[in-house]
Amino acid sequence: MKNTFRAQCQCGQLAVSFTQAPVAQLVCHCRDCQTVSGLPYAKAAFFRAEEQCSEGEFLAVDMTGGSGKPKQYRRCRQCNDFVYATVDALTGLLGVAADKLLPPFEFKPMAHVWTCEKAPETEIPSGVFQFPKAPPFRPGKQ
């Protein structure tokens, strides 16, 4: 039996599930992620979009990413909790708020991205890959 990875909002109305493990896990320091999460950075797990099963109604927050391409953050219509995002620069992937993923998921970031917009008080552990903007690779591509 395959593991199922499920993320949901606080009230449980908005959820997304996947039957495959994430293809990448990143900590994003971009201003948009700071604004949407209300934190100095966002922990994101990227899953293949075609493997998703979503339920519930969401409110869309449309923005333009650093690539100049659109991205859409999706929040629960009832509790306003951010759960996942689509990013046109990462076609075919969904970025899921790692803190919304239920056990047995364990967040293990590959890298910190958009560190040029990092909050001054945020420290990045030594030995971790860091990129001032987007990583030079596309998550999920070999």
Task: Give the ranges of each region predicted by the language model.
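A short Gly-Trp-Pro
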Residues: 1-8, 13-142
